[in-house]
Amino acid sequence: MLYSPGPSLPESAESLDGSQEDKPRGSCAEPTFTDTGMVAHINNSRLKAKGVGQHDNAQNFGNQSFEELRAACLRKGELFEDPLFPAEPSSLGFKDLGPNSKNVQNISWQRPKDIINNPLFIMDGISPTDICQGILGDCWLLAAIGSLTTCPKLLYRVVPRGQSFKKNYAGIFHFQIWQFGQWVNVVVDDRLPTKNDKLVFVHSTERSEFWSALLEKAYAKLSGSYEALSGGSTMEGLEDFTGGVAQSFQLQRPPQNLLRLLRKAVERSSLMGCSIEVTSDSELESMTDKMLVRGHAYSVTGLQDVHYRGKMETLIRVRNPWGRIEWNGAWSDSAREWEEVASDIQMQLLHKTEDGEFWMSYQDFLNNFTLLEICNLTPDTLSGDYKSYWHTTFYEGSWRRGSSAGGCRNHPGTFWTNPQFKISLPEGDDPEDDAEGNVVVCTCLVALMQKNWRHARQQGAQLQTIGFVLYAVPKEFQNIQDVHLKKEFFTKYQDHGFSEIFTNSREVSSQLRLPPGEYIIIPSTFEPHRDADFLLRVFTEKHSESWELDEVNYAEQLQEEKVSEDDMDQDFLHLFKIVAGEGKEIGVYELQRLLNRMAIKFKSFKTKGFGLDACRCMINLMDKDGSGKLGLLEFKILWKKLKKWMDIFRECDQDHSGTLNSYEMRLVIEKAGIKLNNKVMQVLVARYADDDLIIDFDSFISCFLRLKTMFTFFLTMDPKNTGHICLSLEQWLQMTMWG
């Protein structure tokens, strides 16, 4: 993976998420509430179910609608000022570009009309040589933009047409960027960081052109700040501009069919980048004797065969996003090789300008660069003019400490708790694409991406080390769906494939060639107990089916136990009557006293006694007449249930500690007749486990009682088992506050 700090500062230089759709946010709009946490997650899921997030129906980032905000500004005669990404030091960065850094001294925010007369959004079209890097270390982003400019139809999906500094100008622009499985529409104001009336970051070779600077600002807004863009991989930018999936190739050990893969990539309109990897910071941006920059992101912009000395020579066109410093070896702008090529080919290919773009032979490319990255485009990205051979599916998921962050196979006790996904590959590839002759194989590209790390860098977040393992499904487990496989499966069966390495990069991917059949993919962090969100994408050359292996939320509906006073021993009756008094019923406080007196003899549990919340849940569960109290028979039934749950707890407490490990919670709840999917389990562990991922007996009982009560409420109101109920606000408040 490539990380580069970008061009050094000159010695004289001193400077340097989606929710509801109702109203726009910004200086020209009314303020609205924003969703956070679980509410935001549920709302986003609902929006995606309605098709929001597709490119033709992009989700408005931060609930900001470009059309509504621009219309409001035009109506009021104001220029847009973005409250979500203000023209303030906080938008520049947090450390090297932080408010107290000398790198940001004398930076001012200016609109293009304050910098130059008659600014243009786009001037005479767009080409890879239009853009130059500023002082920010985001050469990877510029290399991606440079590659994007070679495919205008893709570029104008990211940079919507019809934007200018003249017609309907209101100081607001917008861009569409792919983020972790969905397209988002990002608006920005046109206040840009400058010094001495010159742009500090990305800028065009033409001083009056501003589309690239505004696109960089939109990407910085998504990432939280400009500094968050420092360091990265060209493929990250290409994926976010196309929604495609990346593959990496080490050129010291290139696959035998690499040239064929390159030709296919060009045919499929794939976008490409390359670099010379470094092993230490001292090598960053040092030059080779052929004027190539180490640790720097280049874009690959073309492939051409030419007649040279009686044979065909394959040339590759490469671009340095700095817009200068070019390869000076064979086939460079002034190389003698061009003199032996037909003049019409020279005119077509050769442009002797210092624009950062150059040609080199395929062999020199292999000898000088160490990493090639190819971004394969997905069918929804491409129009009819382009070809794509991929069928795609994707899933979003989370690793959560204590419930679904099981770590890699080195941790068999928790590995099985990771999210699980199943894929069916019924059909082999076409014979002409199968280099293995008569062996039927299915090409499958699996890509695992962790989400939102750039935005969290300001809080010190680091990329997790991630990877995945793939298992072939044995016959006895085929066609199953609503089940989360347990530890025994993974200790019995061997894996069938895996990501090449576990690595702390945004994405890991592997292209696998598998026999037709069913497979299970387990994505994980390397170490357990690491929180992260992820996107898993599966690309196949033929039709495939896939789904998440997870439990369906379910509770056994057991017959209510019946008891009579004849079943009760005299000590039990005597104790109840003492606590209940003359009323013969007990409320929440009496229930708490009674249970805690009866539980004294249970020495095998670590307990501080039953809390009031747990006792309220018990009354909610057992109270049939709505009185808020329990009679003798109701209490006896409750006590029998509690004893049963105690037995289950004791059975699962294998180390006899009187507590449970949070990863065992799923097994305990299943033994008690309830099955929960990953999303619900994550909530339970977050609520009931302590910092050491331990659940004591009190928390277990409180959790289980709440589950039983909520299932009972829901199923009572859903007699036809539709899986949905409808509540008014009043009913919702009544049930949640009481339950």
From Swiss-Prot:
Record EC number: 3.4.22.-
Disulphide-bonded residues = none
Ranges for domain EF-hand come to 610-636, 640-675
Q: In which tissues is it expressed?
A: Highest expression in testis.
Q: Where is this region: Domain IV?
A: 568-738
A single Gene Ontology MF term assigned here is: calcium-dependent cysteine-type endopeptidase activity
Q: Where is the Calpain catalytic domain?
A: 79-378
Cellular component aspect of the GO annotation: acrosomal vesicle; cytoplasm
List UniProt keywords, sorted A-Z.
Answer: Calcium, Cytoplasmic vesicle, Hydrolase, Metal-binding, Protease, Repeat, Thiol protease
Give the residues the record marks as binding Ca(2+) 2. Answer: D653, D655, S657, T659, E664
**Annotated Ca(2+) 1 binding sites:** D623, D625, S627, K629, E634
The UniProt entry, under PROSITE patterns, shows: CALPAIN_CAT, EF_HAND_1, EF_HAND_2, THIOL_PROTEASE_CYS
The record places the active site at: C139, H296, N320
Question: Where is this protein localized, as stated in its record?
Answer: Cytoplasmic vesicle, Secretory vesicle, Acrosome
Identify the stretch(es) annotated as Disordered: 1-34
Per the UniProt entry, what are the Gene Ontology biological process annotations, in alphabetical order? proteolysis
Q: Assembly state and interactors?
A: Heterodimer of a large (catalytic) and a small (regulatory) subunit.
What family name appears in the similarity comment?
Answer: Belongs to the peptidase C2 family.
Q: What is this protein called?
A: Calpain-11
- Its gene name is CAPN11
